């Protein structure tokens, strides 16, 4: 029998110097979702999530603005959710507040990735 799991998605947070390289360290770069976010951002001439997370040095002027920090937090949370061992855990509920509400919608599969692109969810890119 699988353990039941309630996932609480993070609301506002920070992507600070200690988080730099998080996707590479914990998720081998982040997978398909990160690649899709990278392509989306590149299309707008914005630094990609992979570039931001893989930077040699943390730069407050680069990493802290909302258009970068919000998506870094979002990308890390999506990668964390995707890494849950579904053989061991059954996700029975997903919740969040503030930005975590958007994350919860994504993690729960309420809207698909492509559908989110036209909703304003990524307008901060």
Tell where the protein language model's regions lie, with residue ranges:
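Short capping loops/turns at secondary-structure boundaries
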Residues: 70, 96-97, 114-118
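Helix-rich "cap/lid" substructures immediately adjacent to catalytic or cofactor-binding pockets
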Residues: 2-95
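Gly/Ala-rich beta-loop-alpha elbow adjacent to hydrolase catalytic centers
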Residues: 92-100, 104
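Stable alpha-helical structural segments in soluble proteins, enriched in small hydrophobic residues
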Residues: 79, 102-108
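Short, flexible micro-motifs
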Residues: 13-16, 103, 112
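Alpha/beta catalytic cores of group-transfer enzymes, especially the acyltransferase/condensing modules
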Residues: 108-125
